[in-house]
């Protein structure tokens, strides 16, 4: 199961994080494939990984961490997909093979989203909406066709 929360962050915190992510100050790292069945490109910016802060902009994700009330962070990264001419659903996957939580905070509106395998449900991209679920839940990214970019913040935590 998953839980969806609208207006997750206070507007000032959400706007500060979004302003950073759409600015020229963010370092996006290029990935030539989102999965093995396509050559669809994507980008990410890692804030936290392997028990260390990996971004000078970590301060922007602190309100997210506080609101989630997790005990420990595994990884926090922003993912950027560029507009596609047609909708594409990536392969289903799980984030980690052990018990933990995943939260996806949508930074932009659009017709993309996250597809869950069981139950067969889609959560659409809506600004400041978050979906929280067990990291072993099979899910898939869905690309957008109606917006120049889809940005999500992916948080894995205990």
Predicted regions and their residues:
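Catalytic core of non-heme Fe(II) oxygenases with the double-stranded beta-helix
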Residues: 48-158
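Non-heme Fe(II)/2-oxoglutarate
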Residues: 1-72
